[in-house]
């Protein structure tokens, strides 16, 4: 028999709130390992569902900015380059680690890997990588959403043993399209009503609709 779906969603019916069934932090402090979180940082991540690390690996910002500008020109005819729904302005670039040796090396940097391994209590792999360009004046918003709900329903990820590492390459503030989060929302799963059409991602990557 197939395993029970602990987080059913988009199977018709109505919306519902399901309490998280999985731990948030699987590992512990590792003072002997470089680039890991201390006790207070682990507690903050466990309670809030995210943690911000200012000035983390600042030497990588300029090289990554330059590399992304190269990808924006070299990947014009690739399916992995997603444009805005009403223009040719670039919205996202998927799998940049596949097309860029620099980004591939960066994705393996201990400053990322050691924290991810600590939080998940295991070795890790990349299930999805992307660059969100969000061009000034032309860029469109990303609606409120749960990454895991999409990964679970559309990609088949069974449990919440996953995380997102987000590298801010520009100042993130209230007037340039910042990322908003709801502290503590990771403790509940929002099960969505309705169903999902085949290849929903073809449209949702360009424009998100409730």
Q: Predicted regions span which residues?
A:
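Short C-terminal domain-edge/linker segments immediately following a structured domain
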Residues: 82-87, 157-163, 194-202
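Internal hydrophobic scaffold segments of catalytic domains
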Residues: 1, 58, 66-69, 170-182
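Non-heme Fe(II)-dependent double-stranded beta-helix
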Residues: 2-48, 52-144, 148-155
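Short, conserved beta-strand element in jelly-roll/cupin
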Residues: 119, 152-174
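Short acidic/polar capping segments at secondary-structure boundaries
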Residues: 131-138, 148-149, 169-174, 184-188
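Double-stranded beta-helix
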Residues: 172-210
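Conserved active-site beta-strand-loop modules that form the wall/rim of enzyme catalytic pockets
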Residues: 140, 165, 176-180
């Amino acid at each position: 028999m197939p395993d029970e779906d602990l987080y059913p969603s988009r199977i018709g019916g109505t919306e519902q709130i399901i309490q998280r069934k999985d731990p948030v932090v699987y590992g512990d402090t590792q003072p002997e390992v470089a680039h890991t979180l201390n006790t207070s940082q682990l507690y903050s991540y466990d309670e809030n569902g995210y943690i911000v690390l200012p000035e983390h690996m600042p030497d990588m910002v300029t090289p990554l900015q330059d590399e992304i500008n190269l990808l924006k020109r070299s990947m014009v005819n690739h399916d992995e380059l997603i444009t805005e729904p009403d223009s040719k302005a670039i919205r996202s670039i998927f799998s940049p680690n596949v097309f860029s040796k620099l980004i591939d090396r960066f994705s393996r940097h201990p400053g990322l890997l050691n924290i991810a391994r600590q939080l998940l209590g295991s070795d890790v792999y990349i299930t999805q990588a992307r660059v969100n360009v969000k061009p000034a004046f032309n860029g469109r918003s990303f609606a409120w959403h749960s990454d895991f709900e999409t990964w679970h329903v559309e990609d088949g990820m069974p449990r919440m043993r996953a995380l997102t590492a987000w590298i801010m390459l520009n100042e993130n503030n209230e007037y340039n399209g910042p990322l908003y989060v709801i502290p503590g929302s990771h403790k509940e799963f929002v099960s969505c009503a309705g169903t999902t059409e085949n290849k929903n991602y073809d449209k949702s990557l360009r424009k998100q609709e409730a």
